Amino acid sequence: MIVSRLTFPLQAAKLVARKAAGNPSNSIIQRRHMSGVYFRSGALRPKPDEMPFGLFAIFCAVIPGLFIGATISKNVANFLEENDLFVPSDDDDDED
């Protein structure tokens, strides 16, 4: 019974796939997908230039983000504790 219910949707999906594969505009899209890697002749393009300070740029983005995130979380924890919304109990620290 379940198989008979799935027959029509599966046949419809196969038909849509055949129509999409037969459409010439879809093959153009697939060819353009790799146009950044290959020339029209089929030769590989040269490797792009790398930034000499790429690792430095990553550190300049990550380190301030960590400090800003730590500051925000510290401020939120202080706010929650001051307003008695969340107060950690001392009993939890003694469990070993």
From Swiss-Prot:
Q: Gene Ontology cellular component?
A: uniplex complex
- Please state where this protein is localized: Mitochondrion inner membrane
Q: Which residues cross the membrane?
A: 52-72
Q: Does the keyword Transport apply?
A: yes
- InterPro entries per the UniProt record, alphabetical: MCU_reg
GO process terms (BP):
calcium import into the mitochondrion; mitochondrial calcium ion homeostasis; mitochondrial calcium ion transmembrane transport
Keywords, ordered alphabetically? Calcium, Calcium transport, Ion transport, Membrane, Mitochondrion, Mitochondrion inner membrane, Transit peptide, Transmembrane, Transmembrane helix, Transport
Regarding the membrane, this protein is recorded as: Single-pass membrane protein
Chain segment of the transit peptide: 1-34
Function in brief:
Essential regulatory subunit of the mitochondrial calcium uniporter (mcu) channel, a protein that mediates calcium uptake into mitochondria.
**Family membership:** Belongs to the SMDT1/EMRE family.
- Which PANTHER family has this protein been placed in? ESSENTIAL MCU REGULATOR, MITOCHONDRIAL (PTHR33904:SF1)
Any idea what this protein is called? Answer: Essential MCU regulator, mitochondrial
Species name for this entry? Drosophila pseudoobscura pseudoobscura
